[in-house]
Regions:
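Glycine-rich flavin
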Residues: 24-138
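Intrinsic disorder at enzyme termini
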Residues: 1-12
Length: 138
């Protein structure tokens, strides 16, 4: 096993997310799965921990943590539910960090700030008419 040499902040982050997942997240996910129900409040609960902005710089309302920290958060979410791990990965990694890297300052203020707080949820289109789920053809 590789020793990642986690910082005390990263260890605290893992412990907080693990506790949240077991206490708040897992029971609700299990009940929703049995009922075939999606509860949009689950993302709001993730936002209450600041997870939607985990890697966003503090000036945009995020924690300003590194990608390893995002991976640690995602690993803890994955233990409970792959859907919300995917949602967070897309929100932060695919969309958010793309905006941070290439967007104008105006766009960052418009999108990253509300994304960091969880007021806006990022997504992307994987399936399009006449292209199916072939992203390369979109």
């Amino acid at each position: 096993m590789v020793d990642l040499g986690l910082t005390s902040d990263q260890e605290q982050l893992v412990a907080a997310v693990r506790d949240f997942c077991q206490r708040e997240f897992a029971p609700q996910i299990a009940a929703n799965d049995r009922a075939g129900h999606h509860d949009p409040e689950i993302f709001a609960k993730l936002a209450s921990l600041g997870l939607p902005g985990v890697c966003f710089p503090q000036r945009y309302g995020g924690y300003g943590l590194d990608y390893l920290s995002l991976g640690l958060v995602c690993e803890e979410l994955e233990y409970v539910d792959t859907v919300y791990r995917t949602v967070l990965s897309v929100h932060v990694g695919l969309v958010g960090m793309g905006l941070y890297t290439w967007a104008s300052e105006e766009q960052k203020q418009q999108w990253l700030v509300p994304m960091a707080s969880g007021k806006k949820l990022a997504c992307y289109g994987l399936t399009e008419p006449n292209a199916g789920s072939d992203v390369a053809s979109m």
